[in-house]
Amino acid sequence: MIIETNQACDLVIFGTKGDLARRKLLPALYKLEKSQKIHPDTRIIGTGRADWNTEDYIKIVKKAIKMFLNEKIDEKIWKKLRSRLNFFYIDVFQDLHFLELKNILNQKKNIIIYYCAVPSNTFNAIFTGLGKVNLNSFPSRIIIEKPLGVSLETSKKINNQIAKYFLESQIFRIDHYLGKESILNLLALRFSNSFFFHSWNNKIIDHIQITVSEEVGIENRWNYFDQMGQTRDMVQNHLLQILTIVSMDKPKNITPEGIRDEKLKILRSLKKIDLNEIHIKTARGQYASGIINGKKVPSYIEENGANKHSKTETFVSIKVDINNDRWFGVPFYLRTGKRLAYKYSEIVIVFKKISKNLFQEFNKNLSPNKLIIRLEPNESIKIYFLNKVPGLSKEYKLKSDKMEFNFNINNTKNFVDAYERLLFESMRGIQSLFVCREEVEEAWKWIDPIINGWKKTNINTVQLYKSGTWGPKSSDEIIMRDGRFWETFN
């Protein structure tokens, strides 16, 4: 068992030149330095095949932090972070390079954490190289980014490869959505407040929507994205994890095992979508050209390096049913896409209306109560409720009002970025916010039949939608068939 404490570490970043490292990891490490959460003896070792020395690497790191940090660099903090930085040239297909890396790591007795910020097709070379020189021994840890593979079969292959060299307790599969403050607060919201705890079921809740909307396109990731599509990249990866947190039963305790057990129960309770339902419960789209933030943007098949005949989806929405007592009859509507009208992610819990409302005589089409949990931007919680319109009228006119709690405004000093939190948790050896092998594979078991169903039926085509809109009409039809509507961004 890994000891859960903040110990001196050697953080080895494979792929330190890449987009993930520059945009997310390096700014997160700066913030951890700022909050004094990094052990004084911790080292950060960037690796790659770039023709750099450590001084070159230091300049690259500072440039990345300046570009992607949402605040001005404090030179005192930078000086501390800079002192930790080292660069090591490595070709992961060369065994000799791992021996040289071992010599560097043996200079200190720090716990080693490997962060694989690289494509999954290079994972096995890293696992094998580390294993050959015994750099995989306990209590070293390894962090890998989801999604793992493109199917259950390929995911199992990656998991089998890493299991040859690392114990499950050493493996930290990262899903950055699980590090968001609003997702973590969802556990507190649900299980520590009686009015939510007793209302979180099919007697009180009508339906739940989960939306992850992106303004960006594929961002020069054609080769990666075209083999993945939005379903593999986002639904299997992020939205199903959000769904499990929203819907799981109360865990026995707040341990990694306690939380994972309940999440697994949900994944195993997801109702499979049959071939005869697939056109009713799913919708796919691909972005056409359009206008985003006042600028014209190309269609998916006009992107650099694109296959003009590609049918890969950049948008997907799915109606999900959970086969258990708590959620029987409560649909979950998921949607996610690229080049949509706004960038935002949120969970919408819509409560059932009162069957015989006392004020219905004076009010037609009363809005339902809603709880909206905004994940990004500006993480917040909003509660919508009905309130009397002030005035002297004898009629009881009602309107929908809201109460809002904004994490950024109310907790400015304590607000923590997702990658900042997840890196810190990995340094402490706490796996609660990371995904176990069974979760990954159960998610693929549910997703694979949907993707295969699209191939088997005559709906293996995608509807085009204009960039800057909310996706194809078929997405609206999924929810409108049930007499419901997507909650619009505001």
Curated annotation (Swiss-Prot):
Cross-referenced SUPFAM superfamilies: Glyceraldehyde-3-phosphate dehydrogenase-like, C-terminal domain, NAD(P)-binding Rossmann-fold domains
Pathway this chain belongs to: Carbohydrate degradation; pentose phosphate pathway; D-ribulose 5-phosphate from D-glucose 6-phosphate (oxidative stage): step 1/3
Keywords, alphabetical: Carbohydrate metabolism, Glucose metabolism, NADP, Oxidoreductase
HAMAP family: G6PD (MF_00966)
Reactions this protein catalyses: D-glucose 6-phosphate + NADP(+) = 6-phospho-D-glucono-1,5-lactone + NADPH + H(+)
Active site: 238 (proton acceptor)
GO biological process, one term: pentose-phosphate shunt, oxidative branch
UniProt name for this protein: Glucose-6-phosphate 1-dehydrogenase
Family named by the database record: Belongs to the glucose-6-phosphate dehydrogenase family.
Name of a matching Pfam family: G6PD_N
An example Gene Ontology CC term for this record: cytosol
Residues annotated to bind substrate: 176, 180, 214, 233, 338, 343
Highest taxon of the lineage: Bacteria
Entry binding sites for NADP(+): 49, 91-92, 146
Source organism: Buchnera aphidicola subsp. Schizaphis graminum (strain Sg)
Functional summary from the UniProt entry: Catalyzes the oxidation of glucose 6-phosphate to 6-phosphogluconolactone.
